[in-house]
Amino acid sequence: MKAIIIGILSALFFSVTFILNRSMELDGGSWAWSASLRFMFMLPLLLLIVGFQRNVKPVLHHIRKKPLPWFLWSTVGFGLFYAPLTFATIYGPGWLVAATFQLTILAGSFLVPLLDKEKKQKIPIQAVLISFIILSGVFLTQLEHASAVPLASVLLCVFPLILSAVAYPLGNRKMMQHVDGQLNTFQRILGMTIMSMPFWFLLSIYGFATHGLPETTQVTQTFIVAVFSGVIATVLFFYATELVRNENEKLAGVEATQSGEVVFALFGEILLLNAAFPGIVSIAGILLVILGMVLHSLATVYENRKKHPSLKKAQ
């Protein structure tokens, strides 16, 4: 249950990404700068945090031992996750982007047997079934808006988000396997940020070539995203997944808490960007998303009690 609560908190901070990225897009900012600046700001922040703990050297040592896996899965887990997600804000509001990104819930469940073939782990069916409830809510939440959007805009929003939704759990889990508990959460995020820098420098060059330098307001908002979503939310989410990394049902449950981003992003846009309040269909979708999150939490508790009957007796 602790991992689930931490996951929900991370969803709250992650929602800042969708709200402010949409805000920057509406103000005419470049999606490439919004994406690359976030990670450029994250690097010194993480160096300060990990440096204060005197844990930077183990990270660099681990990277030097096997730089290729670090570079590959950091680029996948951070670069191919966040760049497409930011690009999608051109074609849809933040809450719609957040809703579509919930495909990551199913992606995380279906990746289970592919990522650990030696242990022959099965797809957690219970988690997949509950995830379909969440996705049904996601569909209803975006239905009203999607009906008024041109097909080209829908495709340019959805396809990048499919890539993003698969890349995030894939990169995260492959790095957990590679690190194998040798580094803590902050160290792992620092290492991934360092090794994804070539990707962000290339993207910033593209941003400069197409839009010039970013405006001061975009730099400020990107810094806020870096702190709230890039550092706080990412650390909370990775910490939650680390707590349950060897238990598939619970890991799928933690990843499912990210569906809360839809709710937080929707109400954040209403309050901060004066977005229209959703209709009945969208509200029904939000309720399904919440129901799915609750069911995942209950399933996590049930699974824990089944494995440890003494916990039930103690209560």
Regions found by a protein language model. Name each.
Residues 13, 54-98, 140, 228-246:
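Specific transmembrane alpha-helical segments of multi-pass solute transporters/efflux pumps
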Residues 1-3, 28-32, 36, 62-66, ...:
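Juxtamembrane helix-entry segments on the extracytoplasmic side of multipass membrane proteins
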Residues 39, 118, 251-315:
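C-terminal-most transmembrane helix of multi-pass membrane proteins
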Residues 46, 123-145, 279-300:
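Hydrophobic transmembrane alpha-helices of multi-pass small-molecule transport proteins
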Residues 24, 34, 38, 87-89, ...:
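Hydrophobic/aromatic residues within transmembrane alpha-helices
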Residues 2-6, 32-52, 129-136, 159, ...:
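Hydrophobic alpha-helical transmembrane segments of multi-pass integral membrane proteins
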Residues 11, 37, 97-104, 179-196, ...:
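Helix-helix packing/entry segments at the starts of transmembrane helices
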Residues 1-37, 129-132, 136, 147-177, ...:
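Glycine-/small-residue-enriched transmembrane alpha-helix faces in small-molecule transporters
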